[in-house]
Design a protein with these regions (language model features):
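Beta-strand/loop-rich accessory regions of lumenal/periplasmic or secreted enzymes
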Residues: 2-188
Length: 188
């Protein structure tokens, strides 16, 4: 990704994936168990966590983007009645959020009761996520180190469908190499 100098900094640099609505179970190795952001993560701890998608939603009075998790090593989504899952990992630690609501829906609504669940599970995988700011009650300013700078961003990640309990252990221990050595390694 290349950010242009003439544009305001984006809130995130990454990708949005829309997954099957059946994938309501979430497991991750990263900071948790509660939502955390680059400038709001002192109370979050590195660990392996599990939750349902609905439980990752934070019901702020006015709906807004929420539920981010920083320093993630891997993320897995699966349904309750299957050992099949969708697995995500990356070369570098990443930020993620998983929601039954689209970003458009969160921005459109003024109250929680107005939210309509999406037909998909929305998965954001981010190489960079802006901080929240607001540590000064007069201004919602975000400190410079937590704002996306005009530079090139690189984000190498893997999305894989995994089936069966034996492959789950392999998936949980897999990390992408920093640089692919051959095509077989990338396909792994």
């Amino acid at each position: 990704f290349q950010l242009s100098r003439g544009l305001p900094p984006p809130a995130r640099v990454g990708v949005l994936l829309r997954c099957s609505k059946d994938l309501q179970q979430v497991k991750w190795l990263g900071l948790g168990p509660h939502e955390n952001y680059p400038d709001r993560k002192a109370s979050a701890f590195l660990g392996c966590y599990e939750a349902q998608v609905r439980d990752l939603h934070v019901p702020y009075i006015v709906p807004s983007e929420n539920g981010a998790h920083q320093e993630t090593r891997w993320l897995a989504l699966h349904s309750t009645d299957s050992t099949n899952m969708c697995f995500f990992t990356a070369v570098d630690n990443f930020s993620f959020s998983v929601s039954n609501f689209s970003a458009f829906e969160l921005a459109r609504c003024q109250h929680q009761h107005e939210l309509t669940p999406d037909e998909h599970v929305n998965v954001h995988l981010d190489a960079f996520h802006m901080g929240l700011g607001g540590d000064c009650s007069w201004f919602p300013c975000v400190h410079e180190e937590f704002v996306a700078s005009s530079r090139r961003y690189s984000f190498r990640f893997l999305v894989a469908g995994v089936s069966g309990a034996a492959q789950l252990l392999d998936a949980y221990s897999y990390r992408l190499p920093a640089e692919p050595t051959d095509a077989k390694e990338v396909e792994k």
